[in-house]
Amino acid sequence: KQQTSCKRESFNNIEVIAEYQEVSNSEIVKAAAELVDSGRAGTLSRMEEIIEFAQTMGYKKLGLAYCYGMEQYANAIETLLVVNGFDVSAVSCSVGGLKQSEVNDASCIHKVSCNPLGQADQLNNEEVDLTLVVGICLGHDILLNRSLKMDFTTLVVKDRKFNHAPL
């Protein structure tokens, strides 16, 4: 019996299945399945999954869009990716050194602004294959993701209250 998600489905199954058959989508589905098929689910960390997925997909150049407050972690991630054969472009949220007043005239903060649009432009210009998002603020992550022109995945979500582990 087919599940109906509480009978609230508003999409066409035939069209969705056809989308999965498109080469760019089917390659991702197959690479993702390799990470969990044959009893592998739960055996790899998220970082290990990303490395294996990127290798399977043939990605060579990875982007790292990170919060400057997580620079220590970003450096460790970059090192791990390089050791695993990837070229890495790491871009801090403070790229460009924009003043807060240039980005948000309603803010009372008088420091360098986060610049997710600049991060996206930098990574797009460097033509990375896959971007890992690390600790970008809510809202800024939306702007970043909306502007990236390549595949991307979130490695770390920012959650200041629960030490970046929101669940």
PLM region spans:
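Active-site glycine-rich loop that binds ribose-phosphate moieties when present
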Residues: 45, 111-125, 136-138
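Long, charge-dense
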Residues: 73-121
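Short Gly/Thr/Asp-enriched flexible loops that form oxyanion-binding sites at enzyme active sites
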Residues: 73-80, 141-150
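Short, flexible loop segments at boundaries between secondary-structure elements
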Residues: 149-167
